[in-house]
Amino acid sequence: MQGESTIARRDFLTTALTAASSALTIGLSHTDAHGQEPTHQSYTTTKSPLSFDNLYDTSVLATTLKGEAADRLALRRLVDAWAHCADRRLAEAQSNLFVPNGTIFNYEGDPNTHQPHSTIKGRAAIRSALAVLNTFTVTLHMNGQSDAIIAGDHAIGETYCVVHQFSEQNGQRKCQTLGIRYYDTFLRQESRWYFAERKLVIDWSDSRISVP
């Protein structure tokens, strides 16, 4: 069972599937190139404002909020969009949450004491890696506490997430639960927030037989 758990954890690391966050913050390493806030507008759409298609919009224009409040809402939507797309198997939309050359670094242990286990760079590679989700019958990503520091078009944040992954093996349903943290670097382009870099950290995992 330990060997199977380790393999499953490494498979998960290789694909970096999750969202999320924590009240702890990390030092800001980027500065604003322009030092100005974008002009905000109210969100308009040809669809009904109550359409489910309008959920998880990461644009600061998709709200009547202004300034930092609009940025924080968009960043939280971005984190939640990753979880939503993972569970709904929307690989194209999920990979597009990154800038074109965005990178995921996967860790099995704290980044301060461990080297990345694997690295995934670019939207195409991220999209390809997401295919591992199809090996599970169902997944559930539950985002927890999250915080961010914003400086112009740049931001950083930490996110906590608990992931449940169900699979069928030898006629039995199995569940693997992962405790994950994300250290994110964000970039705002044309009023929309994207992931520039994600450090996925698996703190713990548990595998067991699941009885419906």
Feature map (PLM): residue ranges:
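N-terminal secretory signal peptides and thylakoid transit peptides that target proteins
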Residues: 2-20
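Aromatic-acidic/polar surface patches that form glycan- and anion
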Residues: 5, 68-71, 75, 87, ...
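N-terminal acidic, proline/glycine-rich, low-complexity intrinsically disordered segments
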Residues: 1-6, 27, 36
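Short, low-complexity N-terminal intrinsically disordered segments enriched in polar/charged residues
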Residues: 36-88, 92, 96, 100
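A solvent-exposed, acidic/Ser-Thr-rich amphipathic alpha-helical stretch
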Residues: 91-161
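A beta-strand edge to alpha-helix "cap/lid" segment located at domain peripheries
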Residues: 14-19, 28, 36-63, 134-212
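Extracellular/periplasmic carbohydrate-active domains that bind, remodel
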Residues: 34-35, 62, 72-73, 78, ...
